């Protein structure tokens, strides 16, 4: 990498974009500093000196949010950054996906890309700056990389598309799209939307790509100026004689029949048996190099299985389980599966099954997001779990990984648009989707199961949502789009394009590919075919439950709202929280108070809510001049008696207003605890209440 500092500038969405090389992190294979507005990101790329065994490309992309970038000190006892937030993990995945397909085939060197956010401007996306930084760090390094790539955010406001919308613009945008690609094509899409049509989504993607092309050209100019020397990489060529021999043996032993097996587990058994039988032809225990040969044979076998699956789809239009290219697997759905859960839905599509379980909570149970931007409160959460048993395997039980976090977030994006507004449904909503069985498209099954759970729980959703995953097999100049891909088609195909939405439009999409990029024609066809599949799935789901239940579960908390004057909030809370804690202890409810005076009262017991509401009403009631009250004498002084009008509010009845006749001592007429009827005669500027019994005589 060049050791001389160089600075390159351009404009990006009406803000300055600067890329600096040659000054920082000079021991990395490649490093750049990206300045976008006031956002600053350091991106580095490092490759190992030796390749790794195996067939998987070991790429690791990291995205680190340093709290000092936003002028914050981390919370917690240690006061330092801990494990990456879910949002940082999702950004790392977002950067990984468009970069991964652009490394040479067969490249097995470890590559680690580190993106460190040093300064964060909320209106200048650190995520997109990091994507450009990652591309540039690879491009100016000696690591083989077929870039550059770039990514942009696209909003949709009042019928107009906007590149990299500001925070204020995002609030009114119907679309939150992230799209990436290179000069010739799009190769990554991620979006959440408010029922955007397929045509609107397609235009948004390629509106973004036009800006991507400009950014890629800018990066290419930098590369041409620096002229980095790339390390030579020559993939290991397989022995053609050996390939032909293995190919002949697989055909003789029924490769096509082994692939064309409806049941996933039986197909795996058949293929394993075939591979074992073919490999046995090459076993020679006396040959010291035999182990290396068997590894090569197994690698060839895997390639042949992949080629046969792709050939059958492309040429014969036959899928491994016998379906047509646009056919959905058999569907089953059920609601009310768990008696004590607030809502539950079981969705099965072929050999993929998801159980989604919903819990309702009070507003105090929302999630607090304290990242580089303003602190946010999230009242809808969707979590996704993928246990080993779902694919018939054993293994350690760990906390959620990148994949689980990503699939959970995709489901959350797909469903968040249909969650009712706070004013209509004052609850925190959490859904957990447990994948019980998986043969592809489990994230989309979790979306369908979650919709069923929402309706079962009685959540008044705006519309049901279903999700479907589309696949692609390219061959020479032709291509075949697949509806509802299974695991083998995902692993051996060219695309995993997830589309979720209502009958009216798209609420979320996610596209990953293994080829260089997709044309507008392919994306349009995939979106249109996905719509047909989505509508068919929605029809099936509505046969199970066609509308949200009219009542919440008996085990769910009931939440009611009431509004008080903001200046009365302190009366409800009391000194040091004394009064609000008394209400909670006495009634067992949960209380959440907003600054505008909105109070959320939550409890399973409706009577408890009524008691708490009554107490708060008494605390916040205001005396009215001319109103007659019957209250208890609380205190007696020489000059008069204090009578409780209602809890928290006393009135002074002067000694001259206690009786018609003149009295010398208040105690001659009243004692503490007496019930006394009085009429409010005055409320002074300080809120003190004066009353009279005499006025009623």
From Swiss-Prot:
Q: Which SMART domains match?
A: KH, S1
Q: EC number(s) in its UniProt entry?
A: 2.7.7.8
Give the main EC class: transferase
Q: Which Gene3D superfamilies match?
A: GHMP Kinase, N-terminal domain, K Homology domain, type 1, Nucleic acid-binding proteins
Catalysed reaction(s)?
RNA(n+1) + phosphate = RNA(n) + a ribonucleoside 5'-diphosphate
Please provide, alphabetically and separated by semicolons, the GO molecular function terms listed in this UniProt record. 3'-5'-RNA exonuclease activity; magnesium ion binding; polyribonucleotide nucleotidyltransferase activity; RNA binding
- Which PANTHER family is this protein grouped with? POLYRIBONUCLEOTIDE NUCLEOTIDYLTRANSFERASE (PTHR11252), POLYRIBONUCLEOTIDE NUCLEOTIDYLTRANSFERASE 1, MITOCHONDRIAL (PTHR11252:SF0)
Protein name per the record: Polyribonucleotide nucleotidyltransferase
- Protein's organism: Staphylococcus saprophyticus subsp. saprophyticus (strain ATCC 15305 / DSM 20229 / NCIMB 8711 / NCTC 7292 / S-41)
Give me the gene this protein comes from: pnp
């Amino acid at each position: 990498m060049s050791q001389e500092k160089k600075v390159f500038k351009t404009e990006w969405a009406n803000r300055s974009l600067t890329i600096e090389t040659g000054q920082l992190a000079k021991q990395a294979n490649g490093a750049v500093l990206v300045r976008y507005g006031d956002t600053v990101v350091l991106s580095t790329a490092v490759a190992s000196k030796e390749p790794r065994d195996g067939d998987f490309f070991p790429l690791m992309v990291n995205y680190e949010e340093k709290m000092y970038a936003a002028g914050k000190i981390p919370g917690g006892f240690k006061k330092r950054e801990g494990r990456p937030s879910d949002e940082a993990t999702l950004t790392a995945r977002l950067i990984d996906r468009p970069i991964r397909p652009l490394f040479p085939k067969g490249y097995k060197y470890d590559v680690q890309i580190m993106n460190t956010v040093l300064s964060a401007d909320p209106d200048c996306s650190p995520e997109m700056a990091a994507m450009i930084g990652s591309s540039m760090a690879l491009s100016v390094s000696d690591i083989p990389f077929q870039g550059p790539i770039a990514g942009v955010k696209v909003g949709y406001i009042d019928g107009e598309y906007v590149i990299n919308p500001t925070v204020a613009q995002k609030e009114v945008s119907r679309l939150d799209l992230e799209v990436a690609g290179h000069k010739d094509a799009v190769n990554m899409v991620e979006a959440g939307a408010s029922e955007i049509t397929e045509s609107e989504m397609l235009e948004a993607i390629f509106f973004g790509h036009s800006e991507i092309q400009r950014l890629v050209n800018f990066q290419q100019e930098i590369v041409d100026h620096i002229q980095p020397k790339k390390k030579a990489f020559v993939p290991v060529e397989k022995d053609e004689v050996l390939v032909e021999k293995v190919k002949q043996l697989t055909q003789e032993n029924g490769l096509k029949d082994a692939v064309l097996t409806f049941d996933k587990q039986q197909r795996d058994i058949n293929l394993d048996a075939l591979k074992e039988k073919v490999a046995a032809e090459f076993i020679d225990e006396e040959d010291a190099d035999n182990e290396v040969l068997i590894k090569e044979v197994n690698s060839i076998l895997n390639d042949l299985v992949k080629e046969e699956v792709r050939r059958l789809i492309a040429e014969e239009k036959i899928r491994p389980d016998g379906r047509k290219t646009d056919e959905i697997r058999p569907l089953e759905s059920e609601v009310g599966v768990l008696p004590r859960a607030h809502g539950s839905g079981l969705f099965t599509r072929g050999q993929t099954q998801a159980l989604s379980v919903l819990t309702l909570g009070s507003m105090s149970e929302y999630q607090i997001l304290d990242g580089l931007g303003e602190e946010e409160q999230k009242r809808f959460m969707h979590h996704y779990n993928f246990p080993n048993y779902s694919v018939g395997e054993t293994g350690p039980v760990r906390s959620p990984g990148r994949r689980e976090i990503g699939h959970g977030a995709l489901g959350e994006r797909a469903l968040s648009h249909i969650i009712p507004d706070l004013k209509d449904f004052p609850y925190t909503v959490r859904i957990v989707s447990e994948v019980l069985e998986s043969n592809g498209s489990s994230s989309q099954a979790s979306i369908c199961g979650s919709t069923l759970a929402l309706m079962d729980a009685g959540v008044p959703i705006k519309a049901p949502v279903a999700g479907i995953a589309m696949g692609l097999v390219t061959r020479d100049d032709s291509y075949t789009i697949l509806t509802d891909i299974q695991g083998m088609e995902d692993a051996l195909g060219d695309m995993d394009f997830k589309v979720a939405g209502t009958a009216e439009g798209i609420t979320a999409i996610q596209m990953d590919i293994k080829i260089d990029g997709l044309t507008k024609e392919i994306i349009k066809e995939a979106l249109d075919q996905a719509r047909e599949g989505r509508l068919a799935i929605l029809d099936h789901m509505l046969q199970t439950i066609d509308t949200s239940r009219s009542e919440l579960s008996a085990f769910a908390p009931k939440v009611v709202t009431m509004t008080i004057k903001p200046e009365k909030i302190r009366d409800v809370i009391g000194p040091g929280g004394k009064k609000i804690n008394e209400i909670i202890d006495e009634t067992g409810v949960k209380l959440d108070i907003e600054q505008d005076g909105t109070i959320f009262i939550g409890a399973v017991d409706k009577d408890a809510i009524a008691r708490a509401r009554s107490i708060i009403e008494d605390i916040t009631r205001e005396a009215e001049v001319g109103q007659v009250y019957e209250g208890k004498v609380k205190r007696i002084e020489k000059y008069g008696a204090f009578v409780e009008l209602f809890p928290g509010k006393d009135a002074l009845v002067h000694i001259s207003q206690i009786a018609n006749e003149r009295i010398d001592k208040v105690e001659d007429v009243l004692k503490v605890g007496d019930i006394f009827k009085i009429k409010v005669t005055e409320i002074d500027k300080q809120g003190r209440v004066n009353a009279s019994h005499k006025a009623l005589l």
